[in-house]
Amino acid sequence: MNINEYQNYHETKAHTSAEFPYNTYLCSIPLDFPGVPPHWHDELELVVIKKGQGFVSVDFDKRLVHSGEIVMIRPGCLHAIEQDDTFKMEYENIIFKPDLLSSGANDLCMLQYIMPLLDGSLSVEYFLTPALESFEALSNCIRQIDLVCADQTPGWQLAVKSSLFNFFFLLISESQKKTVSTSSDSKSLEKMKTVLKYVENHYTEKLTIDDMAEL
């Protein structure tokens, strides 16, 4: 997977099958590409740092991440990945559609927990580090997912969904223990998304600051 495919996959590439909308990618910066510019998509994404360190930005919150840490990215969140100086970083992308966690229109778990988490009305930590009380348990969910995906024994999809539900249970439980401060300005985020989409559709034309201001 090259950087151009990665940049534009929301518009040009289906990441998952319709039957089981879940997939993973292993990436290395700068071996595979120098970085991932700001973008967003409709899928939920977990960035799991396997080796090294680098920068991950989520809704303009840029942080240095290290081996073992996890970044949770909601659908629609603007995010980017950058190299830290000369350091290398290997990471796993876990990408899946929210529908994977739904059991139907009247699913209480989806309505009461998952949807509020995904739309931002339920505040949770995005950057998951050893400072969190539940970090080891969260990391174990990822390890279990990796194991069953590697073996793919009959019923492995059930195990993936089970681990994802446990992951979000832990994440939501963690959020109840303390107040998560959020400084994102949703209005500016929507503006940024509009500008990025305009540039993508008109990149062959001469663009000015005035053009951007009128969007």
Predicted regions and their residues:
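Generic protein-terminus/edge-of-domain signal
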Residues: 1-70, 77, 85, 110-112, ...
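Ligand-binding loop in jelly-roll beta-barrel domains
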Residues: 76-99, 106-109
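Short amphipathic alpha-helical/adjacent loop interface patches that line ligand
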Residues: 98, 142, 164
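Phosphate/oxyanion-binding loops and surfaces in catalytic or ligand/nucleic-acid-binding neighborhoods
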Residues: 99-103, 117-121, 148, 170, ...
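Short, Lys/Arg-enriched, Trp-marked, Pro/Gly-tolerant hinge/linker segments that flank
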Residues: 124-135, 149-215
